[in-house]
Amino acid sequence: MTAIYLMSMLFGLACGQAMSFCFPTEYTMHVERKECAYCLTINTTICAGYCMTRDINGKLFLPKYALSQDVCTYRDFMYKTVEIPGCPRHVTPYFSYPVAVSCKCGKCNTDYSDCIHEAIKTNYCTKPQKSYVVGFSI
């Protein structure tokens, strides 16, 4: 009985180490428009984590679609819209952004994901900041 229990625990640990860790993660982004007076700080969720993948030897003989690797990407998401404060009348003050509801390991879809290897470091404000909290700005 103890041997079965011990083996099942070891099997569970081995499977747990092999699983992917891809889930919604809190993320803060800064949004500004050159015509508007303020920068808006938004707290949202994005998909982040690690996915199990294998690098195939013999890449020369495989079609391109077989060479792509899985990434942590959206399974389900919704869009929220906020109003950037301090915009003149001729400028549309609304900004829409995705909120991750659930994530999965899969192929990167460029229709709604940024599939680059290295992010550009532009997540900062050059104008006075306003924070956005659940439906209204402060």
Swiss-Prot record:
On whether tRNA processing is a keyword of this UniProt record, the answer is: no
Q: Which residues form the propeptide?
A: 133-138
GO biological process annotation, one example? G protein-coupled receptor signaling pathway
Q: Which Pfam families match?
A: Cys_knot
Signal peptide bounds: 1-20
Location (main, coarse): secreted
GO molecular function annotations of the record = hormone activity
Where in the cell does this protein reside? Secreted
* Family matches, as PANTHER family: GLYCOPROTEIN HORMONE BETA CHAIN, THYROTROPIN SUBUNIT BETA
Q: Return the protein name.
A: Thyrotropin subunit beta
State whether it acts alone or in a complex, and with which partners, per the record.
Heterodimer of a common alpha chain and a unique beta chain which confers biological specificity to thyrotropin, lutropin, follitropin and gonadotropin.
Q: Which residues are glycosylated?
A: N43
The record's comment on protein family reads: Belongs to the glycoprotein hormones subunit beta family.
Xref: PROSITE patterns: GLYCO_HORMONE_BETA_1 (PS00261), GLYCO_HORMONE_BETA_2 (PS00689)
Query: What is the native source organism of this protein?
Result: Canis lupus familiaris
InterPro entries xrefs: Cystine-knot_cytokine (IPR029034), Glyco_hormone_CN (IPR006208), Gonadotropin_bsu (IPR001545), Gonadotropin_bsu_CS (IPR018245)
**Keywords in alphabetical order:** Disulfide bond, Glycoprotein, Hormone, Secreted, Signal
